[in-house]
Amino acid sequence: MAKNDQKIGWIGMGRMGTPMAERLLKAGYDVSIWNRTRSKAEPLAAKGGKVVDKLADLAGVDVLFSIVSTGKDLKEVYFGKHGVVTGRNGGLPKVFVDCSTIAVEDSADIRTRLKELGVDFVAAPVSGNAKVIKAGRLSAVLSG
């Protein structure tokens, strides 16, 4: 498979995030991965993923995907003390794409905060399961 030029970042290696990131790796993307529990991210290193130690290590990617449990969790990984935005040393991803299912108000707040930094935010909650993802049939509803 030809290597794709875009650098992708991924936050969240749960039952949905892992197979979603794995499909990007199979498609030839350069994917850097962070998960709160590092051991959940490590299996993707064997498939070509780069497991990073800090969220701020994802600040240099082109597109950052996330899929976490709550809006509070998402704000923490983006804007928390050691988040992608606050912990960075330099640039930011051009686009943040969140695949979590969170409150509309949380998405709106995040979009506003990122827009102030000149960054685009796409809310893209997904519907399906790991089997659907592996078959390439995941559904997403995008806004932003």
Describe the role of every protein-language-model region.
Residues T37, T70, V126:
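A generic "binding-loop/recognition-motif" signal
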Residues R23-K26, A46-G48, Y78-H82, I110-L114, ...:
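Short, glycine/charged-enriched secondary-structure capping and boundary segments
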Residues M1-S66, K94-V95, A130-I133:
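NAD(P)+-binding Rossmann beta1-loop-alpha1 motif at the extreme N-terminus of oxidoreductases
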Residues G14-M16, V61, G80-H82, G87-R88, ...:
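Surface-exposed loop/turn and secondary-structure junction residues enriched for glycine/proline
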Residues V52, K72-D73, L142-S143:
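Short alpha-helix boundary/capping motifs
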Residues I8, T101-G144:
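Rossmann-fold dinucleotide-binding core
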Residues W34, I67, S100, L142-S143:
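Active-site-adjacent beta-strand anchor residues
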